[in-house]
C-alpha cells in the first residue's frame, strides 16, 4: 500500500540520517515543509474557509511560515484550487491591489488588472461564479505584513476590507482572505472586532510563542533523526526558556548546535566508533547558550518586537522602559504586578509627556497590546509584569534604563 511504501521510506531515512551530513535547522528564509513542526491547531484554523481572517503576533513567532504552509498545502491548480501568498510589507491599499491583481493575472485568473478595489470585487465575483472561462473551486489570498495596508485602508473607511468581506460572503465558502501582521492588526482587532463595523464580522487568531510540547518537538525531532539525544529534561527546559519559546530562536539554536557538532566531529571530539544515539553532553549544550551570536540574536528579536510601533511615538519601548524602571527600584525583584498608573508615575518623574498625555484607559490598551505581543503577562487583578524575566535583563542595567528614559524627557 501507499502507507507501507511511505513508512519504509521514512524508516530508511531515519536509519541513514545519523551517518550522513545535513543541516535541518534553518533560522531565516524559506522553511521546508518537513521542518514545519507544531502550530497544528493554528494551521487548521487558517486552512478552514470559515476560520479566522485576522492573524497577529510578535516577530519570529511564525506567522509568515504559517501562511506559506497554508499556500503550499492548499494550492492545487490542477484541481482548480488556488492559494496565493503575498508579502505586502510597506504597501498601501493601491500598491497592495496592484501586487494581488498582478499575481492573479499572471496565473490567468483575471484578464485585466482592476484600477480600484471595487473593480477588483466585481472581477472576483465574476471569477467565482464561472463567468470567466477559468474554473475556480477555491481561492485563498494570504496577505502577510498587512500593517501599512490596514492603515491606508482605514483612511478610506476600510473600503478594501469591505470589498474582500463581500467577496467572501458572495462566494459560498469558496473564497477566503487572511490579513497577517503586528501592531496595526492588533489595534484593529482591539478597537473594532466588537463594534458595528466590517471588523466586527472578522474572526481573529493570536500567534503566541510555542507551547512546551511544540518547542520540544521542534528542537528534538530533527536532532533525533540525525542520531543525537539530549538526555536531561532540565537542560531541554533551560534551552527553550533561553529562546523564549520563539520558533525562530529555537531554529537558530538548533542550527548553531549542529554546526558545533560538525566541528567537533572534524576535531574528532566525538567517538565515531559508537553507534547512535549520540548523547550530547550537558556542559557542551550550556556553553552554546552563552554563544555571543545567539545572545545577540535573542536581544535583537526582542528589540524588534518592542519597536513595531516606531511610527507611533515609541509607545511600546517607552512602556517597557518604565516597567524596567519599576523592576530596578525593587533591585530587579518586583514584589507586585504593576498597573497603568505605576507606568504613568514613572513618566511623570522623568517628564515624558508622550505617556503622561495618555489617559489611563489608553495606556492600559497599549499594555494589553504588549500582552498580545507576549512582552507582558497580565494577572486577574489587572497588574502586569514582563512575560519573562530575561526581557527585563534585555532592557539593560539601571543606568541604561534611566539614561534612555531621560532621552525621552520633554526638552
Residue ranges and their predicted role:
Residues 80-113, 126:
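Conserved NTP-binding/hydrolysis module of P-loop NTPases
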Residues 119-184, 189-195, 397-398:
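Conserved Walker B catalytic segment
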Residues 206-235, 253:
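Conserved small helical "lid"/interfacial subdomain of P-loop NTPases
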Residues 8-58, 65-73:
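Walker A/P-loop-proximal flanking segment of P-loop NTPase domains
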Residues 31, 35-38, 232-233, 245, ...:
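Winged-helix-like regulatory helical subdomains adjacent to P-loop NTPase cores
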Residues 116, 120, 229-242:
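Short conserved motifs of the RecA-like P-loop NTPase core
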Residues 390-411:
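Short, amphipathic alpha-helical interaction segments positioned at domain boundaries
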Residues 354-373:
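Short amphipathic alpha-helical interaction segments
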Amino acid at each position: 500500500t501507499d502507507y507501507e511504501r511511505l513508512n519504509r521510506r521514512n524508516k530508511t531515512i531515519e536509519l541513514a540520517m545519523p551517518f550522513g551530513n545535513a543541516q535541518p535547522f534553518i533560522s531565516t528564509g524559506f522553511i521546508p515543509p518537513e521542518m514545519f513542526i507544531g502550530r497544528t491547531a493554528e494551521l487548521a484554523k487558517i486552512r478552514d474557509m470559515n476560520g479566522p481572517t485576522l492573524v497577529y503576533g510578535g516577530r519570529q513567532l511564525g506567522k509568515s511560515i504559517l501562511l506559506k504552509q497554508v499556500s503550499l498545502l492548499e494550492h492545487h491548480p490542477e484541481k482548480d484550487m488556488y492559494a496565493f501568498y503575498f508579502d505586502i510589507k510597506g504597501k498601501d491599499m493601491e500598491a497592495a491591489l496592484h501586487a494581488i491583481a498582478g499575481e492573479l493575472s499572471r496565473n490567468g485568473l483575471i484578464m485585466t488588472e482592476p484600477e480600484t478595489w471595487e473593480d477588483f470585487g466585481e472581477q472576483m465575483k465574476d471569477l467565482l461564479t464561472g463567468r470567466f472561462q477559468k474554473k475556480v473551486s477555491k481561492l485563498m489570498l494570504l496577505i502577510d505584513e498587512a500593517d501599512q495596508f490596514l492603515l491606508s485602508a482605514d483612511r478610506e473607511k476600510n473600503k478594501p476590507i469591505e470589498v474582500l468581506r463581500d467577496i467572501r460572503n458572495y462566494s459560498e465558502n469558496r473564497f477566503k482572505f487572511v490579513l497577517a501582521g503586528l501592531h496595526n492588526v492588533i489595534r484593529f482587532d482591539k478597537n473594532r472586532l466588537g463594534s458595528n463595523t466590517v471588523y466586527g464580522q472578522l474572526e481573529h487568531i493570536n500567534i503566541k510563542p510555542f507551547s512546551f510540547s511544540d518547542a520540544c518537538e521542534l528542537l528534538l525531532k530533527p536532532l533525533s533523526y540525525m542520531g543525537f539525544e539530549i538526555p536531561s529534561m532540565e537542560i531541554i527546559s533551560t534551552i527553550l526558556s533561553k529562546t523564549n519559546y520563539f520558533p525562530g530562536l529555537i531554529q537558530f539554536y538548533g542550527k548553531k548546535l549542529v554546526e558545533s557538532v560538525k566541528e567537533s566531529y572534524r576535531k574528532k571530539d566525538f567517538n565515531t566508533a559508537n553507534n547512535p544515539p549520540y548523547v550530547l553532553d550537558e556542559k557542551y549544550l550550556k556553553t552554546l547558550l552563552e554563544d555571543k551570536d545567539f545572545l545577540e540574536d535573542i536581544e535583537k528579536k526582542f528589540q524588534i518586537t518592542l519597536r513595531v510601533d516606531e511610527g507611533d511615538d515609541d509607545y511600546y519601548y517607552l512602556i517597557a522602559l518604565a516597567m524596567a524602571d519599576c523592576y530596578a527600584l525593587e533591585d530587579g525583584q518586583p514584589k507586585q504586578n504593576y498597573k497603568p498608573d505605576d507606568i504613568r508615575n514613572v513618566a511623570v518623574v522623568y517628564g515624558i509627556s508622550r505617556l503622561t498625555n495618555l489617559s489611563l484607559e489608553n495606556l492600559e490598551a497599549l499594555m494589553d497590546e504588549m500582552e498580545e505581543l507576549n512582552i507582558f503577562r497580565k494577572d486577574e487583578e489587572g497588574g502586569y509584569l514582563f512575560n519573562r524575566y530575561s526581557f527585563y535583563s534585555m532592557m539593560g542595567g539601571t543606568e541604561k534604563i534611566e539614561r534612555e528614559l531621560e532621552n525621552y524627557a520633554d526638552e
